[in-house]
C-alpha cells in the first residue's frame, strides 16, 4: 500500500492520472524494496502508458498481485502497443522512439535487477501493452536505504 501511495503521489501532476485505476490483490504481503527507486520505476512505466493512450478514452491499470513467493506489479494500458522489433531494444540505455532521453526504461531495468527481479512485456500493436515487474518476496540488498513496503 505505501509503495502504491508513493507512486500515485508522484503521478499527481500528470493530467491523465485520473485514467489510472489501482488494484492491490495482496495488501498483506511484505516485499523488501528501495521504495524511492521502485516508485520511480513504476512512475516511468505509468508515464509511458499515459503517452500511449488516447487522453479521452484510454485506460491504465496498476495491478499488484502475488504468486508463488513473488510479487507482481503490472502496468496495463489500452494504448498504441509496442511493435515486436522494438521489444528487444526498448530496455537499452539511451534507446528512444519518441525523441526522449531513452533513460526511463533502462532505469526500470536497473531497479528490477537490483531487486533480483525480472520484467515481462506483452503487447499487441494498436491494442494494449502489459509490463510486469516480478520481484521475490522478502529479498533485496540490505544497504540501509531499503525497507519493507506493504
Name what the model sees in each region.
Residues 77:
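Acidic ATP/Mg2+-coordinating residue in the GHKL
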Residues 38-39:
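A residue-level detector for a conserved hydrophobic packing site
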Residues 112-113:
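Detector for a conserved hydrophobic position within an alpha-helical segment of the HATPase_c
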Residues 30-33:
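Conserved micro-motifs of the catalytic ATP-binding
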Residues 104, 108:
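Short alpha-helical Gxxx[C/S/T] motif in the catalytic ATP-binding
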Residues 82-94, 148-149:
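Short conserved segment of the HATPase_c
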Residues 59-69:
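Short beta-strand/loop element within the Bergerat-fold HATPase_c
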Amino acid at each position: 500500500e505505501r509503495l502504491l501511495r508513493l507512486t500515485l503521489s508522484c503521478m499527481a501532476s500528470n493530467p491523465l492520472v485520473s485514467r489510472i485505476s489501482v488494484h492491490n490483490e495482496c495488501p498483506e504481503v511484505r516485499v523488501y524494496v528501495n521504495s524511492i527507486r521502485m516508485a520511480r520505476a513504476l512512475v516511468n512505466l505509468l508515464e509511458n502508458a499515459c503517452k500511449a493512450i488516447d487522453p479521452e478514452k484510454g485506460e491504465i491499470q496498476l495491478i499488484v498481485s502475488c504468486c508463488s513467493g513473488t510479487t507482481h506489479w503490472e502496468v496495463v494500458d489500452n494504448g498504441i502497443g509496442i511493435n515486436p522489433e522494438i521489444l528487444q531494444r526498448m530496455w537499452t540505455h539511451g534507446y528512444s522512439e519518441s525523441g526522449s532521453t531513452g533513460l526511463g526504461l533502462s532505469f526500470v531495468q536497473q531497479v528490477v535487477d537490483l531487486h533480483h527481479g525480472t520484467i515481462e512485456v506483452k503487447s499487441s500493436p494498436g491494442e494494449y501493452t502489459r509490463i510486469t515487474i516480478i520481484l521475490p518476496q522478502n529479498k533485496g540488498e540490505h544497504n540501509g536505504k531499503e525497507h519493507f513496503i506493504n
